[in-house]
Amino acid sequence: MEDFVRQCFNPMIVELAEKAMKEYGEDPKLETNKFAAICTHLEVCFMYSDFHFIDERGESIIVESSDPNALLKHRFEIIEGRDRTMAWTVVNSICNTTGVEKPKFLPDLYDYKENRFIEVGVTRREVHIYYLEKANKIKSEKTHIHIFSFTGEEMATKEDYTLDEESRARIKTRLYTIRQEMASRGLWDSFVSPREAKRQLKKDLKSQELCAGLPTKVSHRTSPALKTLEPMWMDSNRTAALRASFLKCPKK
């Protein structure tokens, strides 16, 4: 699973996921299913924000090719992927500026058009079950919830899906592709089932012990687009650069 994650996700997403796990004392090499889940969630959050801007009239527009002369503001502020201190700093700043209620838990995004925080969920289970779990945890009508599944289903607060159909279709297609690629490598069952995941972990640990003495060679090539990518909250083209360097999963 770890190899799959490093091959199939943007290197910046992988790095952010590793930092997030280490912040909570978790090891990406051991908890590979969680590693894959965090990378998937991060990518969905970036895709959610992609192409969506607010023009000088305050109208929401979709722009797929950036015009440096256009007076555009990103419609969504990405909160997910930052360290907790920075994330809360951004949330507090938004609340002070807009007057919206401060959420109890860190949300994933802020929508400047609708003036609301958004909690994005990606589930391997039934969407309505995961939605209810999220709603029960957040306990706030102020935070909008939007859940996606790997089977193409989705559920959102008051059936308000925020994004246009095409943008949501891109996210659903990506999730379905990830599922198919996992399945083709025999990884999907363990990703869905905790019991199967534990069995696979024991098997992986045993394999590591057997291979501990073997020489290894690792490639650390960096995508050209990422060499110039600044931290995402500093660069106005953060999602465009990220999108440009998305990697497709290579077949075995």
Swiss-Prot record:
Active-site residues (renumbered): E80, D108
Gene Ontology biological process: viral RNA genome replication; viral translational frameshifting
Record site: Important for efficient shutoff activity and nuclear localization: R195, K198, R199
InterPro entries referenced in this protein's UniProt entry, alphabetically: PA/PA-X, PA/PA-X_sf
Positions of transmembrane segments: none
Keywords: Decay of host mRNAs by virus, Eukaryotic host gene expression shutoff by virus, Host cytoplasm, Host gene expression shutoff by virus, Host mRNA suppression by virus, Host nucleus, Host-virus interaction
Molecular function via GO: RNA binding
Site (Important for efficient shutoff activity): K202, K203, K206
Subcellular locations according to the entry: Host cytoplasm; Host nucleus
Cited function: Plays a major role in the shutoff of the host protein expression by cleaving mRNAs probably via an endonuclease activity. This host shutoff allows the virus to escape from the host antiviral response. Hijacks host RNA splicing machinery to selectively target host RNAs containing introns for destruction. This may explain the preferential degradation of RNAs that have undergone co- or post-transcriptional processing.
Family as reported in the entry's similarity comment: Belongs to the influenza viruses PA-X family.
Domain notes: The probable endonuclease active site in the N-terminus and the basic amino acid cluster in the C-terminus are important for the shutoff activity. The C-terminus acts as a nuclear localization signal. The C-terminus is recruited to host protein complexes involved in nuclear Pol II RNA processing.
Protein name: Protein PA-X
Source species taxonomy: Viruses, Riboviria, Orthornavirae, Negarnaviricota, Polyploviricotina
Gene giving rise to this polypeptide: PA
